[in-house]
């Protein structure tokens, strides 16, 4: 379908794919993509050819499936993965009886989950009102970025779509910044904050280029000025 939509030459140059699907479906899609891009994902590559941003389906986030997820990620050593369940899904993957409710508990959980993926990959946990936590394998540290509406919770109307949109914004920031996890996490939280301000999709003004009355730059600048001091390692 992607080849028909974009054409093979363009698709072969696409380096980032966001997947929201099961383990089996993810494996099949990755294998199909690599055939089109003409490289073996089970072999180490001399240059980065494909990054998969994997948002697992909620129903596969069970402790019994963690070894299978681990096997899939570690089996495709020629691909970079950004694995991103939310905090509730992460807790089920690790066999917790309940979802962590504090930032410190989420940090501990993120480190534990990261231990189950190969060292060249990132683990991004979406923690709702607590923001996002990313394990940076290169710096060997956690990066916490607060939720966009930390100071304005009264503006949150409907959280539906916040997680999906976070990863869309994260992917955009990650690509534009050439892999800067801090920038990507900020973009993810900014976009997610916009999505949850109403029921349904945000109001788009094509003339002013605003979502719910604010441009992306205005939202980005607001986030930087209000939350950047909260970055924690």
Give each language-model segment a name:
Residues 8-11, 76-77, 116-117:
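Alpha-helix termination/capping residues and helix-transition junctions
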Residues 39-49, 62-65, 96-233:
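Conserved phosphate-binding/catalytic region of the ribokinase-like
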Residues 1-7:
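Eukaryotic helix-linker segments that join adjacent hydrophobic helices
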Residues 3, 27-31, 70, 217, ...:
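Generic detector of well-ordered alpha-helical segments enriched in charged/polar residues
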Residues 6, 71-72, 79-82, 121, ...:
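Generic structural signal for short, flexible, solvent-exposed coil/loop and linker residues
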Residues 14-111, 130-131, 137:
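Conserved beta-alpha-beta core of the PfkB/ribokinase-like small-molecule kinase fold
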């Amino acid at each position: 379908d992607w080849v028909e939509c974009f054409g093979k030459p363009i698709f072969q140059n696409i380096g980032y794919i966001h997947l929201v699907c099961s383990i089996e479906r993810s494996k099949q899609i990755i294998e199909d993509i690599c055939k089109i891009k003409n490289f073996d994902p089970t072999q180490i590559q001399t240059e980065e050819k494909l990054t998969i941003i994997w948002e697992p389906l909620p129903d596969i986030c069970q402790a019994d499936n963690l070894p299978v997820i681990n096997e899939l990620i570690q089996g495709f050593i020629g691909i970079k993965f950004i694995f991103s369940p939310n905090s509730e899904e992460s807790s089920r993957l690790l066999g917790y009886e309940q979802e962590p409710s504090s930032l410190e508990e989420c940090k501990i959980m993120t480190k534990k989950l990261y231990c189950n993926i190969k060292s060249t990959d990132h683990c991004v946990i979406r923690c709702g009102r607590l923001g996002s936590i990313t394990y940076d394998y290169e710096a060997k540290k956690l990066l916490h970025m607060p939720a966009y509406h930390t100071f304005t919770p009264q503006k949150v109307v409907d959280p539906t779509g916040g997680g999906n949109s976070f990863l869309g914004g994260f992917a955009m920031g990650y690509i534009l910044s050439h892999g800067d996890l801090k920038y990507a996490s900020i973009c993810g939280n900014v976009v997610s904050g916009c999505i949850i301000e109403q029921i349904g999709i945000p109001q788009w003004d094509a003339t002013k280029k605003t979502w719910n009355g604010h441009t992306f730059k205005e939202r980005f600048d607001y986030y930087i000025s209000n939350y950047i001091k909260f970055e924690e390692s």
